Amino acid sequence: MIALEAINVTKVYGTGVNAVTAVNDVSLSVKRGEFIGLVGPSGSGKTTMLAMLAGLLTPSDGQILIAGKDIGRMSEGKRTRFRGKYIGFAFQANNLVPFLTAQENVELLLRLNGKLNRQGRQRTRDLLTRLGLGERLRNRPGQLSGGQQQRVAIARALIHEPEVVLADEPTASLDTERAHQVVQTFADLIHEQNRAGIMVTHDLRMCKYVDRVIQMMDGKVSRTIFDRQAILQLAGSASDLEGVPPSLVAEPASLGL
């Protein structure tokens, strides 16, 4: 079942001679239980695309459907409420509330959705423990390292069991060992909870945990890697997508993108 779909999405900044097209006619879909790696060089449009999928930016053209709802047609108030229920996101600027503990920061999403009860508190503790923060539940953000704060943000993205989970460089502040642990746990939770997940990353080693890799270039989807062997090769030995054999890479047209 498709949880998220982008149809011919374009984002243009500015007007006239100053117009810049950041995303150009991109289509993609993600099924429930599927974890996608979105990669590409700086300026390729991947972060802008993620922000539109999160409902934080409105497309200049095209549609973004989550749970069958076109979020681009919603009023700002309705979209904010929709995001709180259906979308979980962990961006580099994780915006943790400084005077709340790690546990309270994660529980905030449950509180806003009217789901903060004994079961929700236990689920929060279990999730933070699984992310290696079991001994940091009562610490405030200022008492946590950057990597620990990022893991709290990941827990917050998952705790309310959203339809779609989006992450922008979730391992940016983590050492290699912890990065692998966090992304593997992230992927496991997406699969276990049957969510649709997209992770933007510059660290191709993290792609070993995804089900499909989508490359963006100059605002467009340039290629998709769907073969498990190719994904592992990308994550293990290739420095970029050019190192993956063409026979294991699908052009967008062949996938209906």
Task: Give each language-model segment a name.
Residues 60, 142, 246-247, 253:
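Generic low-complexity segments that are intrinsically disordered, proline-rich and/or Lys/Arg-biased
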Residues 2-209, 215-216:
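ABC family nucleotide-binding domain
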Residues 220-248, 252:
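Conserved beta-strand-loop-alpha-helix hinge in the C-terminal portion
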